[in-house]
């Protein structure tokens, strides 16, 4: 393969013919492949089936988990999540199977009531705003969009969001009420915030007294290498600056046990814990304590969680490697037409193609039987300013399907690139 960027129009047309023939071969296969969402595969969920073997319903303190009560969650469940997140059990609220629901509920509290330090509910603020590191998690952005909260893009780097920009915007504009963050193995780049980035979040001054950091630790134990990466605990780092009330940390067992039957958790300050419980107690008496107990008995402690996640890692690494190897073999020789991330953990690989090509790549893949996350989905309002980013989710399909999908993707990337270059030369 030659460098596409150095080809003449005639050479590009010849390459286009070859690629279209290869593409038609894929279309003729009648493929049905899906790499659109970061879901655990059946082989991963099978690892946690022993969770259902426990029939015990009595908590350590004698609480009958079958009954009402314990809004904040069973103490042993709070202790387990506290150990995973690096906070005291008393600062943990254990919810249902969805941490996303907890995030939605907290934005709703801000919107409807405000927080103790709020001058007024967010709904009464003229043009309330959120900072959104990009590319980021599409479902975060859907929450703020649902409430009509304006979203501001903040560029990401391997060290985290552009903190100069975050500090400037949040420090000057009181209508900016929060920021979405995935600090460890970020969705979708797989970046982990540097210690300095975390500490700048902890210390920064904000114009809004009720500025909130939605700190989504979705991948806190989801390592893909022998290196166990851990970031400073934002809630603890914020205390010396008196900023602990601005921190909402989230995690869940969605990608540890079962996405549809797991347990979620929120960590926050003492003051915020009291306030959140005051709001939640009107809505629910308690979440599923039997499920909390099952998870505690199965996972036991942080060491147990890490041991369980090692089993996940053994199944996932070959799939991630297959994507990266195929990209390197089939795209690198074509010149600087694409690059991709090399995550040490998490659930995704970011593929960056030439500006103006991502939507076309996704379209070609779909028409050949491979569904990807929509181009632009990792940006607020679904609008990628460069039309260059695609999120690759290699976790759910089988290894053979990942290999086949990766090969097809490279054909689509190359074809879209050649089309783009020919259009530029026309």
What is each PLM-predicted segment?
Residues 38-42, 99-100, 136-138, 159, ...:
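Short, solvent-exposed loop/turn segments at secondary-structure junctions
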Residues 361-367, 405-410:
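Short amphipathic alpha-helices in soluble, non-transmembrane regions
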Residues 63-209, 220-242, 408-426:
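Conserved core of the PLP fold type I
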Residues 123, 236-317, 330, 418:
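Conserved core segment of the aminotransferase class I/II
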Residues 2-72, 76-83, 367-370:
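N-terminal "arm"/small-domain region of PLP-dependent enzymes with the aminotransferase-like
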Residues 310-324, 336-352:
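Conserved glycine-rich beta-strand-loop-beta hairpin in the small C-terminal domain of fold type I
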Residues 350-355, 372-412:
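Conserved PLP-binding active-site segment of the aspartate aminotransferase-like
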């Amino acid at each position: 393969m030659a460098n596409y960027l150095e080809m003449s129009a005639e050479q590009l047309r010849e390459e286009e013919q070859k690629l279209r023939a290869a593409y038609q071969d894929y279309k003729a296969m009648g493929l049905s492949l899906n790499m659109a969402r970061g879901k655990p595969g059946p082989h991963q969920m099978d690892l946690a089936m022993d969770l259902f073997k426990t029939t015990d319903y009595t908590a350590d303190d004698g609480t009958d988990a079958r009954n009402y009560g314990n809004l904040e969650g069973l103490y042993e469940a709070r202790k387990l999540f506290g150990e995973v997140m690096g906070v005291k059990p008393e600062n943990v609220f254990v919810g249902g199977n969805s941490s996303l629901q907890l995030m939605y509920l907290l934005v709703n509290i801000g919107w409807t009531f405000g927080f103790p330090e709020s001058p007024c509910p967010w709904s009464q603020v003229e043009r309330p705003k959120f900072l959104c590191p990009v590319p980021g998690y599409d479902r975060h952005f859907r929450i703020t969009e649902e409430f009509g909260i304006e979203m501001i893009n903040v560029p990401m780097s391997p060290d985290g969001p552009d903190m100069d920009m975050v500090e400037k915007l949040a420090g000057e504009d009181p209508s900016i009420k929060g920021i979405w963050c995935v600090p460890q193995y970020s969705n979708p780049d797989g970046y982990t915030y540097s210690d300095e980035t975390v500490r700048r979040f902890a210390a920064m001054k904000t114009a809004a007294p009720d500025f909130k950091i939605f700190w989504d630790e979705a991948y806190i134990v989801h390592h893909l290498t022998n290196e166990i990466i851990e970031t400073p605990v934002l809630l603890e780092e914020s205390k010396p600056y008196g900023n602990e009330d601005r921190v909402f940390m989230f995690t869940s067992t969605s990608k540890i046990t079962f996405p549809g039957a797991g347990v979620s958790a929120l960590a926050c300050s003492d003051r915020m814990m009291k306030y959140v419980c005051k709001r939640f107690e009107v809505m629910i008496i308690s979440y599923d304590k039997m499920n909390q107990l099952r998870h505690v008995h199965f996972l036991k402690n942080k060491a147990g969680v890490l041991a369980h996640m090692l089993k996940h890692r053994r199944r996932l690494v070959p799939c991630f490697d297959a994507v990266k190897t195929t990209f390197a073999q089939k795209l690198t020789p074509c010149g600087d037409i694409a690059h991709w991330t090399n995550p040490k953990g998490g659930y995704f690989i970011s593929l960056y193609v030439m500006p103006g090509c991502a939507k076309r790549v996704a379209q070609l893949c779909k028409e050949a039987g491979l569904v990807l996350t929509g181009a632009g989905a990792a940006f607020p309002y679904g609008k990628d300013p460069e039309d260059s980013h695609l999120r690759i989710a290699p976790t759910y399909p089988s290894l053979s399907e990942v290999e086949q999908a990766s090969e097809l993707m490279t054909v689509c990337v190359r074809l879209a690139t050649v089309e783009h270059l020919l259009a530029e030369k026309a």
